[in-house]
C-alpha cells in the first residue's frame, strides 16, 4: 500500500485529517493481533499474555523540554477516525495542562531531588508495566502499552532506529522518520519523483524468546 496517497484519499473521503501516526497505530494493532507474543508483558521474569492492543504515542507538550505519553486502548477494535478523535482529544488535554494524571506526576517530580528522579521513575514504570495502578500518583496500568510510537519527522531525519526507553518496558517501538523525495524509474521506464517515508522497528527480543 502507498501510505501517503492512501492517507490523502481517506482524509478527503471522511473529511478527517489522517496522519502517518494514525496509520501507524492502526497498522500496529493489525500486526499485533496476528502475533500475540508482542502484546504480553513480563512479570517477575515470567511472560504473561495480555488482552487488547494498547498503543502509546509520545507527545511534545512543552517547548521541547517536556515529553508526555498517551495510550490508546484496544486499538484493534477502533477504526482510524475513532483513533484520530481519541488521540487528538488526549493531546489537547496534555498540551492545555488539563490531564489530571499527568499533572499529578509532574507535581510529584517537581518536589523530589533530581538524584532520586531516575530510580523513582524506573520503579513507578515497572509497577505500571506489571498491571498495577496507583491512582493517587496518576499511575495507570500498562502506561506505555504494548508498543510505543514516536515521530522524528520534524527533526528532518530520514532514517533512524530509536532504542526502546528503559522506563517503557514495551516490546516494540516504532519510529516514523521524515518524508523525503527520490527520483525513481517507473514501470514505463520513465524517471519520476516519489515521496517516501521509513517506518523502523526496534524490538525487545525477550518477548519473542518467551514464546518460542
Across the structure, where does each feature detected by a protein language model lie?
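C-terminal catalytic/motor cores of large multi-domain enzyme assemblies
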Residues: 1-212
Amino acid at each position: 500500500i502507498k501510505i501517503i496517497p492512501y492517507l490523502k484519499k481517506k482524509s478527503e473521503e471522511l473529511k478527517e485529517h489522517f496522519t502517518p501516526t494514525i496509520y501507524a497505530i492502526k497498522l500496529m494493532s493489525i500486526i499485533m493481533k496476528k502475533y500475540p507474543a508482542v502484546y504480553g508483558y513480563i512479570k517477575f521474569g515470567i511472560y504473561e499474555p495480555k488482552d487488547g492492543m494498547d498503543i502509546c504515542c509520545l507527545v511534545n507538550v512543552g517547548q521541547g523540554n517536556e515529553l508526555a505519553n498517551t495510550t490508546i486502548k484496544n486499538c484493534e477494535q477502533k477504526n482510524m477516525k475513532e483513533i484520530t478523535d481519541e488521540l487528538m482529544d488526549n493531546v489537547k488535554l496534555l498540551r492545555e495542562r488539563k490531564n489530571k494524571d499527568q499533572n499529578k506526576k509532574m507535581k510529584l517530580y517537581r518536589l523530589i531531588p533530581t538524584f532520586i528522579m531516575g530510580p523513582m521513575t524506573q520503579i513507578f514504570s515497572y509497577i505500571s508495566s506489571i498491571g498495577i495502578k496507583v491512582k493517587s500518583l496518576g499511575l495507570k496500568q500498562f502506561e506505555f502499552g504494548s508498543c510505543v510510537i514516536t515521530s522524528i519527522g520534524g527533526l528532518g531525519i530520514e532514517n533512524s532506529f530509536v532504542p526502546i526507553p528503559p522506563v517503557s518496558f514495551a516490546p516494540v517501538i516504532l519510529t516514523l522518520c521524515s518524508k523525503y523525495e527520490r527520483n525513481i524509474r517507473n514501470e514505463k521506464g520513465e524517471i519520476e519523483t516519489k515521496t517516501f517515508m521509513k517506518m523502523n522497528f526496534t524490538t525487545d527480543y525477550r518477548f519473542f524468546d518467551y514464546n518460542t
